Design a protein with these regions (language model features):
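Signal-transmission coiled-coil "S-helix" linker that connects upstream sensory/regulatory modules
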Residues: 1, 8, 12-15, 33
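Conserved nucleotide-binding and Mg2+-coordinating catalytic segments in signaling enzymes
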Residues: 15-34, 55-69, 77
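A short pre-motif secondary-structure segment
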Residues: 93-96
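Short regulatory alpha-helical coupling segments
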Residues: 15-16, 29-49, 80-88, 107
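Catalytic-core segments of nucleotide cyclases and related cyclic-nucleotide turnover enzymes
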Residues: 69, 111-119, 136, 149-185
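Alpha-helical scaffold within the catalytic cores of cyclic-nucleotide enzymes
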Residues: 80-84, 113-131, 163-165
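Cell-envelope/extracellular polymer assembly enzymes that use nucleotide-activated donors
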Residues: 51, 143
Length: 185
């Protein structure tokens, strides 16, 4: 019986390790993709919208070049924690999408609700006050692209990722430290 408990505990730890980012402690991309797929199917069944925030630390390469990789790692941890803190609902999924990119899945959330969460996150990053002398803003900032969709059988979850990434690209093109929403037109 004791051996069975130890094996169960070890299996649970393996699941936790395989689904979380080792640096930040939040979900990793693999877990994000699985969570989005599950939420997409659930939302389609119940005719609910799903919103996605794609977040990118502005001028992060310059941050690493200026302060070093240890400071960069600390910055990533602090930003991940702040994003998690401002994505408050248990149904929200915060994940490291890659490098300095983070994604937030917001279940049952319209574009308006996603804008409110995104603004809280962006403001929260500003409150961290992490110095960044190589940024025109003087501190670490975040660009956020948002998209929301009502899942159907003809639109896969990858379409939502693509839309949020397009909005993120526009936020960066328009000067960074801002939120842009995806508009299909």
């Amino acid at each position: 019986l004791s051996l069975t408990r130890k094996l169960d505990a070890a299996n649970q730890e393996l699941i936790r390790i395989s689904s979380s980012d080792s640096l930040t402690g939040i979900a990793n991309r693999r877990y994000f993709e699985e969570a989005l797929s599950i939420e997409w199917r659930r939302a389609r069944r119940h005719s609910n919208p799903v919103a996605l925030l794609m977040c990118d630390i502005d001028f992060f390469k310059l941050f690493n070049d200026t302060y070093g990789h240890l400071a960069g790692d600390d910055c990533l941890r602090r930003v991940a924690h702040a994003i998690s803190r401002h994505s408050e609902r248990p149904s929200d999924t915060v994940a490291r999408f890659g490098g300095e990119n983070f994604a937030v899945i917001l279940a049952e959330t319209s574009i308006g609700g996603a804008l409110m969460v995104a603004e809280k996150i962006r403001h929260g990053i500003g409150e961290l006050g992490i110095p960044h002398v190589s940024s025109p803003f003087g501190q670490v900032t975040l660009s956020i692209g948002i998209a929301s969709a009502a899942p159907g059988f003809d639109n896969p979850p990858d379409d939502l990722i693509l839309a949020a990434n397009k909005a993120l690209y526009r936020a960066k093109q328009e000067g960074r430290d801002r939120i842009c929403r995806f508009d299909a037109a």
